[in-house]
């Protein structure tokens, strides 16, 4: 995820779909294929579609009770030195409280994870960081979205991730080993927001049992937690890497993320219209932040004005987090 020119945006994305909406997503995907002369049972890519049919597809999806999350980074600004510096900082963060851990086994486990993270190639580290950021973003926002609209959908989290190769990739191996620790570290510094009056009963299987909340939260971080969600169980309970040809959901999100990438690179004939349509799939972020996460390893580089305008359009069109009464 590094390139020679600024503006070389890459992105990852996820589509949150409840069981009730799965058939509707598949229907609109099939209609898109048919309208462009393709067999519904096959795969299509954004390059095979007319711009008008693609944006109509996005508009059709926006009318469903589904949400898109995305993390994007400008590969042209991700120099090797900047990525390595960020990587070292993440390793330091993981090791920060290792001396306070009670059990030797736990300390050894953290040391092993930090070693594995430190030896990742920069490109793989960027890919892993974007994917972990995406998954944390999903959990931190999708729960409150569905707790208001379709609380029963929270009973089961099933993650289906695009498998790029038939054989197990270095990324899949790194993701399985390292993402739980990175997610855990993030959840401590950014606790999930729960809103009084929302219906969280569907999350019962993901809650720590009484008295089972990890004691290190209080001993190490000073957090007095009497209850909480087991983030690792939410993520790892049902996760599979699948070939996109076997998953209509993965095919749909592949088209969506391709559109986000093309829009940020300003390669649509009407980028503002594309930003407006894509923004309708996204979910409002707190503190008036963009609905998609923008990761930069170059803090001294402001977002280009043209891209900033497109992101603002997405913000203006995104789905509201809270139901209007």
Q: What name fits each language-model region?
A:
Residues 2-325:
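Phosphate-ester processing/binding pockets and catalytic centers
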């Amino acid at each position: 995820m590094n390139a020679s020119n600024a503006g070389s945006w890459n992105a990852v994305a996820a589509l949150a779909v409840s069981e009730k909406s799965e058939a509707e997503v598949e229907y609109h995907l099939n209609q898109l294929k048919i309208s462009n002369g393709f067999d519904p049972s096959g795969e299509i890519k954004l390059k095979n579609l007319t711009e008008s049919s693609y944006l109509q597809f996005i508009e059709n999806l926006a009318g469903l009770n589904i949400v898109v999350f995305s993390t994007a980074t400008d590969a042209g600004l991700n120099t090797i030195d900047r990525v390595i510096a960020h990587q070292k900082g993440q390793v330091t963060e993981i090791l920060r409280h290792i001396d306070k851990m009670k059990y030797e086994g736990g300390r050894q486990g953290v040391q092993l994870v930090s070693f594995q993270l430190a030896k990742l190639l920069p490109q793989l580290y960027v890919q892993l960081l974007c994917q972990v950021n995406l998954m944390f973003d999903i959990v931190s926002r999708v729960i409150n979205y569905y707790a208001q609209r379709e609380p029963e959908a929270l009973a089961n989290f099933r993650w289906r991730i695009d498998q790029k190769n038939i054989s197990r990739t270095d990324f899949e191996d790194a993701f399985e080993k390292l993402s739980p620790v990175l997610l855990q570290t993030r959840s401590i510094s950014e606790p999930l927001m729960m809103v009084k009056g929302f219906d969280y009963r569907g999350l019962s299987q993901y809650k720590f049992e009484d008295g089972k909340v990890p004691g290190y939260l209080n001993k190490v971080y000073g957090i007095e937690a009497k209850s909480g969600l087991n983030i690792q169980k939410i993520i790892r309970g049902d996760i599979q890497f699948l070939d996109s040809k076997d998953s209509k959901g993965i095919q749909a999100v592949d088209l969506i993320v391709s559109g986000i990438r093309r829009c940020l690179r300003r390669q649509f004939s009407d980028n503002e219209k594309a930003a407006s349509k894509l923004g309708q799939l996204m979910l409002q972020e707190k503190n008036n932040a963009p609905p998609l996460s923008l990761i930069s390893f170059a803090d001294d580089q402001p977002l280009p004005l043209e891209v900033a305008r497109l992101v603002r359009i997405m913000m203006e069109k995104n789905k509201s987090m809270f139901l209007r009464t």
